[in-house]
């Protein structure tokens, strides 16, 4: 089974507030949009929050009442994205593969998620890392086969899983998409 892990434990320093709660044009929040996009196509969605986000977790549970969505408060969230991802992979190690979403990238299209899932299924025996690209520029979400979970759990700092991707270029399956959502993140209120 492929599950989603949504990394939502960052500090939003550049945004000037909690960008996860910022509203998009349609009134839905950034994180809620990302959760719905993942939950629509994946059987299991784990949302990784900051360690002190217990109240926000309860708020999300009330807003997003979906049986395939669960939440995890990363004990190492203050140490950076790699630590939160490592904690999440450990917590969700029963998966065959994990599709890693970034909470601040709510514009990824459903067709893109389907294309990535199809590419993983077509290459599953090769234990791929499936990565979307727009005009050759790599983006998110990225699917990692379970064979990479141990390496992901050893990551440190704030670079995410980039070192794992860099170490396994021969395993990369790049899917060119016409979806700027895979490279468009929200760093400032102007990005909404």
Annotate each PLM feature:
Residues 1, 150, 154-192:
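Conserved alpha/beta core of the MobA/IspD/sugar-nucleotide pyrophosphorylase nucleotidyltransferase superfamily
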Residues 1-3, 65, 122-125, 189-192:
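SAM-dependent methyltransferases
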Residues 1-54:
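N-terminal glycine-rich phosphate-binding loop and ensuing alpha1 helix
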Residues 10, 104, 188:
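Active-site glycine-centered loops adjacent to acidic/histidine catalytic or metal-binding residues
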Residues 15-25, 29, 51, 72-83, ...:
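Residues at secondary-structure transition points
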Residues 31-97, 110-111:
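Conserved N-terminal catalytic core of the sugar/cofactor nucleotidyltransferase
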């Amino acid at each position: 089974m492929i599950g989603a892990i949504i990394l939502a434990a960052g500090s939003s320093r550049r945004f000037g507030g909690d960008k996860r709660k910022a509203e998009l044009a349609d009134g839905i929040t950034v994180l809620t949009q990302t959760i719905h996009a993942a939950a629509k196509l994946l059987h299991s969605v784990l949302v990784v929050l900051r360690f002190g986000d217990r109240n926000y977790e309860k708020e999300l549970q009330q807003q997003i009442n979906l049986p395939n969505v669960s939440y995890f408060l990363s004990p190492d969230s203050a140490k950076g994205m790699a630590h939160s991802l490592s904690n999440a992979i450990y917590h969700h190690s029963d998966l065959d593969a994990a599709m890693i979403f970034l909470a601040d990238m709510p514009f990824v299209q459903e067709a893109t998620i389907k294309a990535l899932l199809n590419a993983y299924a077509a290459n599953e025996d090769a234990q791929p890392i499936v990565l979307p690209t727009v005009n050759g520029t790599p983006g998110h979400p990225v699917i990692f086969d379970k064979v990479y979970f141990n390496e992901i759990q050893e990551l440190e700092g704030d670079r995410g899983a980039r070192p794992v991707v860099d170490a396994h270029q021969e395993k990369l399956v790049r899917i060119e998409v016409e979806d700027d959502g895979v490279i468009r993140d929200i760093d400032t209120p102007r990005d909404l």
